[in-house]
């Protein structure tokens, strides 16, 4: 859906988008539409088309999952969606420039900071919930306390801490699974997680995969 450039495939997806838009325009039962989860929707021609033509009405609410790099520019372009936004989830896997740009390839730390500051300023205008999604792994677990401090300052409603999963991206996923007891950084990781486990911003309190 996100990065498809094949002409025939795109035509098919635009037709599907048209059917979704038509359904949304005629439904008044109350719907929550999730936009994203398979890449950044603001980088997708199909998702942009869907958001451009999505209805601006109270019975249809939207939730967006994004990496946040394009969001400031897109908020005005798709005001019909943001006027009815229920939740904004931003994937942020680092709280410093070096870590963020190492993990989020192609990401620019200054741009994500600028965009998060913008959301912080306009969030109350749109009345949506704002979550950070943070995929915990070896290269970023030490920055969890910093991320929580940043979330507090910005007014983020919740921080979702999620373990890294094996998407066949790494040749040895075990070296990144810092929550496993046989990992060389486990003790340090466990100490950090215990220090933040009661933080009010942490949304998922099921830490069976994190704590002993």
Residues covered by each model-derived region:
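Radical SAM enzyme [4Fe-4S]-AdoMet core and its adjacent flexible, acidic
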Residues: 3-18, 26, 52, 59, ...
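Conserved SAM-binding loop
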Residues: 47, 64, 69
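Conserved alpha-helix/loop element of class I SAM-dependent methyltransferases that forms part
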Residues: 21
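Short beta->alpha connector loops
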Residues: 41-42, 67-71, 94, 137-140
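Acidic donor-diphosphate engagement hotspot in glycosyltransferases and nucleotidyltransferases
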Residues: 46-47, 74
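LRR N-terminal entry segment and analogous cap-like coil->beta motifs
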Residues: 25-33
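Conserved LRR concave beta-strand detector
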Residues: 32, 61-63, 87
């Amino acid at each position: 859906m996100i990065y498809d450039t094949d002409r025939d495939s795109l035509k098919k997806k635009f037709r599907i988008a048209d059917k979704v838009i038509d359904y949304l325009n005629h439904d008044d039962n109350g719907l929550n539409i999730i936009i994203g989860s398979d890449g950044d929707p603001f980088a997708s021609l199909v998702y942009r088309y869907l958001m451009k033509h999505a209805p601006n009405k109270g019975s249809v609410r939207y939730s967006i999952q994004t990496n946040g790099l394009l969001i400031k520019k897109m908020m005005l372009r798709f005001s019909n969606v943001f006027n009815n936004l229920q939740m904004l989830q931003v994937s942020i896997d680092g709280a410093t420039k070096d870590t963020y740009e190492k993990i989020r390839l192609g990401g620019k730390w200054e741009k994500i900071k600028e965009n998060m500051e913008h959301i912080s300023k306009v969030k109350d205008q749109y009345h949506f919930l704002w979550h950070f999604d943070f995929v915990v792994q070896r290269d970023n677990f030490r920055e969890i306390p910093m991320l929580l401090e940043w979330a507090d300052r910005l007014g983020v409603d919740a921080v979702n801490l999620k373990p890294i999963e094996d998407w066949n991206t790494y040749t040895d996923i075990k070296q990144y699974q810092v929550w496993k007891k046989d990992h060389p950084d486990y003790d340090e990781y466990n100490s950090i997680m215990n220090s933040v486990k009661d933080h009010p911003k942490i949304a998922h309190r099921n830490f069976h995969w994190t704590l002993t």
